[in-house]
Amino acid sequence: MPLRPGRCYRKFSGPAYTRREYIPGIPMPKITKFVMGNVNGDYDYELRLITTEKGQIRHNALEAARVIALKYLSKKLASEQNFALVVTKYPHHVIRENKMMAFAGADRLQDGMRLSFGKPIGTAARLEKLGELVMYVRVKKEHLEAAKEALKIASSKLPIRTKIEISALNKEAAAQ
C-alpha cells in the first residue's frame, strides 16, 4: 500500500503511543544517522532549524531533510570536515493506520470503523512545544551562506513550518 501524504500525520491528539514492548510489528525508522561531519571541529557559527508550530514529523521526512542538507553541504563545502550536522529529534511515536479497502464490494469484506485501532505503519517525532530544535549545523564564517541554504532546503522537506536561527559560537564571530 502506498505511503499517505504527510498532512495525514502532521497534527496529533492524545498521548504518545511509544511503548514498544507492547506493540508488535513496528517498522524500523528510515533515519539511522543523527550526527554527520566533523563534530569536534572549531566553528564560528551555529545555525538552528527551529519549529514555529506544533506537530509531528515522520521518520521518512526527517531522513529526507537530513539527506538533502548533508548532500548540499558536502557539495558546496567540498568536504565533510568543514561542517557538523546534527539531527536532534528521534521518531519515538508509533503511527497507526486502519487500512481500508477501496474497490467495488469492499463494504461486504471489511468492518468499517468497528475495531478500528489500526496497525503500526511507521514512527514520528512529536514536537509538542513551539521553538523546538529539529537539527543544527555548525560552520566557519566563510561557509555561513551555504549552511543557511542547506537548512532552507531541508526545511522544505518537513511538514511543519520552521525558521533558521543563527548564533555565534565564539567571541570573534560575535563581534563581527
Swiss-Prot record:
GO cellular component: ribonucleoprotein complex; ribosome
Entries under PROSITE patterns matching the protein: RIBOSOMAL_L10E
One GO BP annotation of this record: translation
NCBIfam families: PRK04199.1-1 (NF003236), PRK04199.1-4 (NF003239)
Protein name (database record): Large ribosomal subunit protein uL16
HAMAP family per UniProt: Ribosomal_uL16_arch
Keywords attached to this entry: Ribonucleoprotein, Ribosomal protein
Keyword Ribosomal protein: yes
Alphabetized Pfam families for the sequence: Ribosomal_L16 (PF00252)
GO molecular function: structural constituent of ribosome
Domain of life: Archaea
Keyword Ribonucleoprotein belongs to the record: yes
Family: Belongs to the universal ribosomal protein uL16 family.
